[in-house]
């Protein structure tokens, strides 16, 4: 629980660079993930998809924009709200159908041994059956889950389980690690204000217990928002939020013996989670607790997953991750010369992260090194500021909206990680408890982005709309010769429902045709200085050496996308509303890690802009107001998207190499 959602807007935006949309909270970029925002603080959320809507956000809006507006205070009586929510988490996709009965497994394995004795060993049917009964348990590593002798477990005449056999243990690898988890959330908010000042404050606590044992997510959030109208021409405000998330996240993914899902699907039901003696009594460890079975004990040698027990690792390994997030925003709006407004926005996000990844010395992945622990700390600070100058003018039926802006982003990341092995106390993950330092590393990276942008919007009689925008961005991730990128967009829409021939049709609330085209860039390449050669300092026979880790490429530049969008918005009878849109997104200069010839040495890859990709498709959404009264409101909405992704230039490149 607590994992950040993967958000894709209209398909895959990139191959090697970031595919995540930009998150905007109250008008400024937010560097965190959505799971750190209290849902109860959100007033509205909108997803911007086409180039005309995203153009003002430049390179960071290449994969779409998620616009979030938080709640604010209102003029009037102070209101206090408290709500509590409870729920349950359970496994949604049940385990695949496999043999989960020990007796059935013994019978099937016995049949396989008998057939092998006849087909490979050349034995008669009777000889093969007796041999299979005698070697069944030894072949399975000495594991006998029943209270009869090994050779008597399967009747060699019938091939069935001995009717006198009684099960000594019955553990299910596909069920025992899971449970029903309680989810509880509490929200407290207060809002109010006067004619000039409004305020909103909230506190939130979320405790989300997973359906997997020893796995949970906790979140604490607080928010304070204040807006103040100083006088007729000046308005100011600030918005401060704090969030802490604590995640206990065991290893469950992948296709290895540490994964509960993989291990549980593949291990036979005759192998227990805990150790048992021949009477079926649990064997206790030194602490008096039931001892886990790792498949290698006296008289037992499990042929599958020896030294592995992912359930034991689930309960004994420690994987705890904590984020502390402080976000602050301040703004000032100045109105002057009647039609002009200047807005200054300043936001700062400060992220602190600590992580513990401890693998127990009792058994599992770190058994051979007597335990292993990684400790990680990371600090990320991002500063965003923009200055906006707007001019709004209405002349008769003509309305103009002109925007000029400047934006700067600066961030700094510091990272420190150390790893030790050979731990004295088996449940203490602190590095001071480990004897052997195996790895320690740290780095600091910085990133700068600057942009100048403009937008012109025009409409005539609230019927015909035109918009155009231009933005010029510079990114520190590129060589100075390729640092600047130019991006633009144009759009138009026609509100047909305002035409004289439709204006009096009561069934039609709105009907609008729209189209846009524009270009955008993406600089989120995963490396803050990819145009520079990068090295790591290493020990070399008692001296200082370096390794060549990254082959720089000063010709790297922006990933560029051309976006076309056309659609229709509709609303009928004050009940049904929605839209249908067709889109094409063609991206060129995609980042690609190109293999180098052996003669070039190491590193044997280099990052280049050498791919192209196309996303095209159609999406539709509809909302129906089933009940819309003062006391009851019931809306139902649905959406569907169908798109095709095509990597165009890569196929030509592979064909040219004959692959």
Where is each model-derived feature located?
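Low-complexity intrinsically disordered tracts that form flexible linkers/tails across taxa
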Residues: 247-273, 650-654
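Extracytoplasmic beta-strand/coil segments of soluble accessory domains associated
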Residues: 1-26, 44, 54-74
């Amino acid at each position: 629980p607590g994992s950040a959602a993967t958000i894709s807007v209209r398909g895959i935006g990139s191959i090697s660079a970031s595919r995540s949309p930009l998150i905007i909270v109250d008008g400024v970029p937010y560097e965190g993930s959505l799971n750190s925002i209290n849902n109860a603080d959100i007033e509205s959320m909108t997803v911007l998809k086409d180039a005309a809507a995203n153009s003002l956000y430049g390179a960071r809006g290449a994969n779409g924009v998620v616009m979030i507006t938080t709640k604010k205070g209102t003029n009037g009586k102070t209101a206090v709200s408290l709500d509590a929510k409870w729920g349950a988490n359970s496994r949604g996709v049940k385990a695949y159908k496999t043999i989960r009965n020990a007796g059935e497994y013994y019978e099937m394995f016995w049949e396989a041994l008998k057939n092998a004795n006849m087909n490979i060993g050349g034995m008669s049917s009777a000889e093969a059956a007796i041999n299979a009964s005698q070697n069944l348990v030894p072949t399975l590593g000495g594991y006998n889950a029943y209270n009869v002798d090994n050779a008597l477990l399967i009747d060699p005449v019938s091939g069935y389980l001995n009717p006198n056999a009684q099960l000594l243990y019955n553990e299910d690898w596909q069920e025992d690690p899971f449970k029903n988890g309680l989810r509880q959330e509490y929200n407290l908010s207060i809002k109010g204000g006067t004619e000039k000042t409004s305020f909103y404050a909230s506190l939130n606590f979320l405790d989300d217990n997973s359906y997997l044992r020893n796995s949970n997510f906790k979140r604490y959030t607080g928010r304070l928002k204040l807006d103040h109208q100083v006088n007729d021409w000046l308005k100011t405000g600030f918005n401060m939020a704090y969030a802490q998330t604590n995640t206990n996240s065991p290893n469950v993914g992948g296709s290895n013996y540490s994964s509960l899902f993989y291990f549980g699907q593949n291990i036979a039901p005759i192998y227990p989670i805990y150790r048992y003696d021949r009477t079926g009594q649990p064997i206790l460890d030194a602490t008096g607790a039931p001892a886990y079975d790792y498949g290698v004990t006296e008289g037992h040698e499990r042929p599958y997953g020896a030294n592995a027990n992912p359930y034991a690792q689930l309960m004994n390994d420690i994987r705890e991750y904590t984020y502390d997030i402080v976000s602050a925003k301040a703004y000032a709006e100045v109105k002057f010369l009647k039609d002009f407004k200047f807005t200054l926005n300043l936001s700062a996000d400060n992220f602190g992260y600590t992580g513990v990844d401890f693998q127990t010395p009792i058994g599992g992945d770190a058994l051979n090194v007597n335990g292993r622990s990684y400790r990680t700390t990371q600090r990320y600070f991002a500063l965003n500021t923009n200055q906006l100058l707007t001019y709004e003018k209405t002349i008769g039926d003509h309305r103009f909206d002109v925007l000029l802006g400047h934006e700067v982003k600066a961030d700094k990341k510091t990272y420190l990680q150390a790893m030790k092995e050979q731990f004295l106390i088996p449940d203490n993950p602190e590095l001071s408890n480990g004897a052997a330092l195996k790895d320690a590393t740290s780095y600091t990276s910085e990133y700068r982005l600057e942009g100048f942008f403009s937008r012109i919007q025009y409409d005539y009689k609230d019927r015909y709309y035109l918009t155009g925008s231009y933005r010029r961005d510079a990114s520190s991730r590129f060589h100075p010769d390729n640092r600047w990128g130019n991006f633009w967009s144009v759009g138009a829409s026609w509100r047909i429902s305002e035409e004289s021939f439709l204006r009096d049709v009561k069934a039609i609330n709105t009907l609008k045709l729209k189209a846009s085209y524009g270009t955008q860039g993406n600089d989120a390449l995963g490396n803050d200085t990819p145009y520079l050669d990068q090295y790591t300092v290493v020990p070399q026979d008692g001296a200082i050496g370096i390794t060549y880790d990254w082959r720089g490429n000063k010709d790297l530049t922006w990933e560029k996308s051309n976006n076309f969008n056309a659609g229709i918005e509709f609303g009928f009878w004050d009940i049904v509303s929605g839209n249908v849109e067709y889109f094409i997104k063609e991206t060129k200069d995609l980042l690609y890690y190109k293999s180098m010839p052996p003669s070039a040495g190491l590193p044997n890859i280099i990052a280049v802009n050498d791919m192209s990709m196309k996303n095209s498709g159609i999406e539709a959404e509809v909302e129906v107001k089933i009940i819309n009264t003062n006391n009851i409101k019931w809306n139902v909405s649905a959406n569907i998207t169908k798109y095709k992704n095509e990597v165009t230039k890569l196929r030509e490149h592979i064909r040219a190499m004959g692959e």
